[in-house]
C-alpha cells in the first residue's frame, strides 16, 4: 500500500511498534521474510509485560464443565488469586482454546479467561 494509517489518542491500551521503514524496499522484504518471528517476539513481550502466560494457538475444542459443587470460576489469569470473570455451572458447554500448565484458556459465553482443567471434560 502507499498509505499508512496511524492511530492516536486511543481510549484503550495500545502498542505502536516500528520495526523498519515499510517504504524502504529492503526493509519491506526483511519484514515479509521475518513476520512470524516478529509476531512471536511481540506476543512474548506483551504477555511478559502484562504478566500472563504465552499460550501457543491450538484448534478450539468443545468441553463440558464437570463440577460437583456450585460452579467453576473463569479467571482473569491462571491463578486461584486472580479476579473471577464469570461462573460456569455443571454441564455448561465451554470452548477450550489452549492450555498452560493445569489451566485451560477458555471462552465461556464470550468471556475469555482461565479455568482449572480438572473440571472440564473435553468432548471427542
Where are these regions (language model features)?
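Active-site-adjacent mobile loop/cap segments within catalytic or ligand-binding domains
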Residues: 1-57
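SH3-family beta-barrel domains
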Residues: 55-73, 86-90, 98-100, 121-124
